[in-house]
Amino acid sequence: MAEICYRAKITHTEKTVEQLYKMQYYVYEKLRMLLRMLLGFGLVLAAVVTDIPNWGKALLLLAGAWLLVSKDFPAAVRADRALSERKARLPNMNYSFGPETVHLSGEGSMDIPYGKFTRLVEDKQYLYLFVNRNSVCMMEKDSVKPADIMAFAKFMEDKTGLKWRAEKPFLSMSIYDLRQALRDMRGK
């Protein structure tokens, strides 16, 4: 690989794998989250307004409340499945950012051209470079070297043509977020 502009890494743990799957779910499954929430609300409402036996109301309330409070349950299930398949063999990933590609090394190695990335997302601790809904490069913010995270963010925006976005709480979704959720559902 040519000149290295930046380096980053992550040492995966159960916590980071769970966070990775949760972020994939938050980024690509907003519509599913909305539908789960609406279904949960509908079940709770049905329990309150319908004239059915108390045991039926209790079941509706239980199911509705569970759907409302377990918004990222599908992500947790996927993370548990991935952790079980790996049987505690979690990868250490190293990223080298060159002029044209990102070089990944860890369990294997590959180069990803910057044009292949579709989303740049950050949270308090990690950066996520999405290629698609099933492929993401996750790295710790404090592992980026040289340690100027703002310069790195600008570098990635310039190379990919994308803007960074911080994943927002579900209830602060905008019309743009709903439009993007519909596009994600259609695979665009």
What are these regions (language model features)?
Residues 109-111, 118-120, 134-137, 145:
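Short, surface-exposed beta-strand-loop junctions and turns on beta-sheet-rich folds
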Residues 102-104, 110-127:
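Phosphoinositide-dependent membrane-docking surfaces
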